């Protein structure tokens, strides 16, 4: 895939507003296609997402962000799609997270508390060594959880429920961002395993 600079010069430059918005929609479709490919495999076996596919998703994300900046330079304002506005707000609010609750099969397995300089994780009522807050927040930012859907089920992918694992992630903020709840049964966001790896150390 081309660099951001090449994309801006060779693809973006000279396009009108309508063309740029259409380009953004095309990139979002490509991102969704890649994510769904990973998520379908995760239903059968939860694994870390392949690096090459993650890299492509990141590139499409960069193209979308640059396209929105280009719209702003042309128009002075951006007509955000609802899901994109939520994604932006979630990403900007990551430094203001105060707690994350994570559970599987309705058991409170993990509570993550954000102190001034560190993150305290309690798993099954046992506290693990604290983690540097800046490191943890940067890792959360890389997950782009604001792009996740609110609910994931096997039915989303044309499969019957396997009656397996249900999970829940609840994110609390100390700014004006509302509490966000993600849930799933037998299905997961494409980088869910990366999230689990982060909180398990």
List where the protein language model places each region.
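Conserved beta-hairpin
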Residues: 110-115, 119
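Short, well-ordered, aromatic-rich surface patches in folded extracellular/luminal domains
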Residues: 41-106, 117, 124-135, 140-201
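Short, solvent-exposed coil/turn linker segments
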Residues: 8-11, 112-113, 144-147
């Amino acid at each position: 895939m081309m660099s951001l600079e090449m994309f801006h010069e060779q693809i973006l430059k000279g396009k009108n507003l309508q063309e740029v918005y259409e380009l953004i929609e095309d990139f979002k479709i490509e991102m969704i296609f890649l994510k769904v490919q990973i998520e379908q495999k995760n239903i059968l076996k939860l694994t870390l997402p392949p690096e090459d596919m993650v890299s492509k998703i990141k590139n499409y994300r960069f193209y979308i962000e640059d396209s929105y900046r280009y719209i702003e330079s042309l128009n002075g304002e951006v007509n955000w799609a609802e899901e994109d506005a939520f994604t932006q707000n979630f990403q900007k609010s990551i430094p203001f997270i105060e707690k994350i609750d994570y559970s599987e099969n309705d058991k409170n397995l993990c509570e993550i508390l954000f102190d001034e300089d560190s993150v305290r994780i309690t798993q099954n009522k046992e506290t693990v060594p604290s983690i540097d807050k800046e490191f943890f927040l940067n890792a959360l930012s890389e997950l782009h959880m604001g792009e996740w859907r609110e609910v994931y089920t096997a039915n989303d992918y044309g499969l019957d429920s396997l009656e397996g694992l249900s999970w829940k992630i609840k994110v609390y903020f100390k700014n004006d961002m509302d509490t966000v709840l993600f849930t799933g049964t037998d299905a997961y966001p494409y980088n869910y395993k990366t999230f689990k790896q982060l909180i398990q150390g």
